[in-house]
UniProtKB/Swiss-Prot annotation:
This is Large ribosomal subunit protein uL4. One of the primary rRNA binding proteins, this protein initially binds near the 5'-end of the 23S rRNA. It is important during the early stages of 50S assembly. It makes multiple contacts with different domains of the 23S rRNA in the assembled 50S subunit and ribosome. Forms part of the polypeptide exit tunnel. Signal peptide: none annotated. InterPro entries: Ribosomal_uL4, Ribosomal_uL4-like, Ribosomal_uL4_dom_sf. It comes from Thioalkalivibrio sulfidiphilus (strain HL-EbGR7).
Length: 201
């Protein structure tokens, strides 16, 4: 299949195996959920009745006081007592096989092509870290909300984009399913596209 390079108006031949797949919604959903779950801290913790201090001695004798029987001052029904079913730190990460992850990424890229949300440019560099210059370049392509994908780190591009809402910059190695589906457009350079094709082949 062929994709048009927007700034040179030339056609670029790309693999149908990577950019012409059918959309697998279930697999993409699984990849997105797994990625987001991996970002959860899972550090919350509460104290149960075995964690709170005190509670060794029986507060009063079992019978004769007229009060309800009690064995510890750290019972969950007491003030300052332990929490019932206390939260513990846990790992939320989900395992997703490499083969499934790559298939999900192929599916996402194919859908981006189908929806005309993948914008290919020959190169996308800015001479200086100026937001104004980047805005002009994006405006020339008719893009306002986009993930810019490059083949290597570009400090000027990153500094120019970091103050723009709805614009982010990523290298091919840092791509993730959430970023790809979360922007209106994915602006990708030809070298980066070749890297993606090689990675997902």
């Amino acid at each position: 299949m062929k994709l048009q390079v927007q700034d040179t108006k030339k056609d670029l031949e790309v693999s149908d195996q990577t950019f012409g797949r059918e959309f697998n919604e279930d697999l993409v959903h699984q990849a997105v959920v797994a990625y987001m779950a991996g970002g959860r801290a899972g550090t919350k913790a509460q104290k149960g009745r075995s964690d709170v201090s005190g509670g060794g001695a029986k507060p009063w004798k079992q019978k004769g006081s007229g009060r309800a029987r009690a064995g510890t001052i750290r019972s969950p029904i007491w003030r300052t007592g332990g929490k019932v079913f206390a939260a513990r730190p846990r790992d939320y990460s989900q395992k997703l096989n490499r083969k499934m992850y790559r298939a999900a990424m192929r599916s996402i890229f194919s859908e981006l092509v189908r929806q005309e949300r993948l914008v290919v440019v020959d190169s996308f560099a800015v001479d200086a870290p100026k937001t104004k210059g980047l805005l002009e370049k994006l405006g020339g392509l008719g893009v306002s909300n986009a993930l810019i994908v490059t083949d290597q780190a570009d400090a000027n591009l990153y500094l120019s984009a970091r103050n723009l809402p709805g614009v982010d910059v990523s290298e091919v190695g840092g791509l993730d399913p959430v970023s790809l589906v979360g922007f209106e457009k994915v602006l990708i350079t030809v070298p980066a596209l070749k890297q993606v094709e090689e990675w997902l082949a």
